[in-house]
């Protein structure tokens, strides 16, 4: 039974709210969904006979994501980890902890303006396979506020230096 619920969660992995999660956080989300279903439907046969079974799992996913994000959106880095934002070209490599913290603070403020509650934000992320345009725009705005051109050049130089000083792989 648990495997079936996990499969439904995995089938939703293309949703932007889930796609960007690191493996550990995704596993926690999956466990939250399975546990919630088991607690709500201790007799699995009742759950299995629901006509809207996948809709029920979707609703539980949204609830678990809302819980994961936190009441004040304090856990946005779990949904949009810095390294993934860096790979996507939104943030440069080599930002200081203060700059990363400022970025997430800015993003939190903009998302609060766009979505009144974490649940509404979660629904928006879950409904679309990609990041909603409004959220992507907010990310770009926050990145440009946090990273000055001089900081960008400095971060790029640091990343290049770090890459050049990394040990060679495969024995080369």
Residue ranges and their predicted role:
Residues 1-172:
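Mature extracellular/luminal domains of secreted and GPI-anchored eukaryotic proteins, especially small
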